[in-house]
């Protein structure tokens, strides 16, 4: 401990945060794979109609998100998509549509992304999350989570969310080392032999063409 700071505690907290982030990214990657091929691709250059300003073209992305949500409703017969995960780039697109029809149906204000976090609500029903580590052209993942614990696309069940061994000495080098362990189960009900096999019906991907995107 120097200057009133417990270095050991700071390092362990940082490592724990990194492991938590890795788990988040693993789950998001699995959901994106489960969703499969994108059902639509947002391309600003092909938006129809005459836009009065760039935000009108950006608002077209909300239409595609709504379409994906309604497709999920027709697949599952449970409900429309009520959450989505976007990249910081797509979050910027949503932010720039503040004076379009999209903004008038959005509750609250968007926050700057700091991790995979809740940033706003679309159409008073869809919770929007941002994945800070996603690339500009990363798909938008739209999904449905019902009121019950079993009404979802996949299930993350941590037995031990995160456990630390504390600082111990390596018997070979006598260097201080620390170990972390996590135990969890992750399942997607895709096997029709043992379940309905409809996990993929709960999620959908929307592609994003970021190469010709304009913000002014």
Positions of PLM-derived features:
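Extended, solvent-exposed, turn-rich assembly/linker loops in the middle of proteins
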Residues: 40-110
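Secondary-structure transition/capping motifs at alpha-helix termini
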Residues: 21-26, 72-79, 216
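Sequence/fold signature of self-assembling virion shell proteins
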Residues: 1-3, 7, 13, 96-216
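Long, well-ordered alpha/beta core segments of mature domains
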Residues: 25, 74, 88, 126-128, ...
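An acidic- and aromatic-residue-enriched active-site/binding cleft used to recognize and process polar
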Residues: 20, 87-89, 183
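Alpha-helical scaffold segments that mediate packing/assembly in large oligomeric complexes
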Residues: 1-2, 6-67
């Amino acid at each position: 401990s120097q200057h009133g700071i417990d270095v050991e505690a700071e390092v362990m907290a940082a490592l724990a945060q990194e492991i938590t982030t890795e788990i988040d990214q693993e789950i998001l990657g699995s959901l994106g794979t489960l969703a499969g091929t994108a059902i639509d691709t947002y391309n600003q250059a092909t938006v129809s109609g005459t836009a009065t300003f760039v935000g009108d073209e950006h608002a077209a992305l909300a239409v595609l998100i709504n379409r994906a949500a309604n497709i999920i409703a027709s697949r599952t017969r449970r409900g429309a998509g009520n959450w989505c995960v976007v990249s910081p780039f797509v979050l910027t697109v949503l932010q720039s549509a503040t004076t379009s029809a999209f903004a008038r149906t959005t509750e609250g204000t968007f926050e700057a992304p700091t991790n995979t976090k809740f940033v706003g609500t679309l159409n008073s029903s869809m919770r929007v999350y941002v994945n800070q580590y996603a690339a500009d052209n990363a798909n938008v993942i739209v999904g449905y989570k019902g009121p019950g614990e079993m009404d979802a696309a996949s299930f993350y069940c941590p037995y031990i969310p995160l456990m630390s061994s504390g600082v111990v000495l390596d018997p070979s080098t006598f260097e201080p080392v620390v170990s972390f362990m996590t135990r969890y189960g992750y399942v997607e009900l895709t096997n029709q032999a043992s379940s309905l096999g409809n996990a993929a019906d709960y999620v959908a991907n929307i592609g994003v063409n970021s190469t010709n995107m304009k913000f002014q």
